Amino acid sequence: MPIDFLQPADIVAPQLLGCIFTHDGVSIRLTEVEAYLGAEDAAAHTHRGKTARNAAMFGPGGHMYIYISYGIHRAGNIACAPEGVGQGVLLRAGEVVAGEDIAYRRRGDVPFTRLAQGPGNLGQALNFQLSDNHAPINGTDFQLMEPSERPEWVSGPRVGITKNADAPLRFWIPGDPTVSVRRGRPKTRK
């Protein structure tokens, strides 16, 4: 059954693991994601309401929210939940499965497992641009292909944030070498 992006982000997030996500000549298999739950989640960009910067997260679900992180990295979320709710899933890490040569040109001389490891590196490998903001994930610029079989996954605390960090809203494929952060004990296993 296809992913329903009108569901809450914490329901959508683990369904994205193992999906092939393609943009600008590079395809990655998603191995790590984080859910952000809008107004109820102090770590979400949408916690304090809708702004020009975060408007893409307010829907419709299934569209990209691209933003600048730490003043230099372009990171991407997929908006989730009904329009107006402001939830999304941050794409944290993946394995390059097509377009490896293009990813290396964008990322430089890094180990293969680090080509799309971490949200900024993933954004660089896939060449996210601010002009991609609001783009549908299954349109002309982005494609998402679901796996024939869903991988096992675990969840645990999010990383790189201070607010609501202990919430088990980071989801990853256990043992995958492309996962960006290995600290944090899994709280759930599926």
From Swiss-Prot:
Belongs to the DNA glycosylase MPG family. Keywords: DNA damage, DNA repair, Hydrolase. It comes from Corynebacterium efficiens (strain DSM 44549 / YS-314 / AJ 12310 / JCM 11189 / NBRC 100395). InterPro entries: Formyl_transferase-like_C_sf (IPR011034), MPG (IPR003180), MPG_sf (IPR036995). One of its GO terms (biological process) is base-excision repair. Its EC number is 3.2.2.-. Pfam families: Pur_DNA_glyco. GO terms for molecular function: alkylbase DNA N-glycosylase activity; DNA binding. It comes from the Bacteria. It is an enzyme of class 3 (hydrolase). This is Putative 3-methyladenine DNA glycosylase.
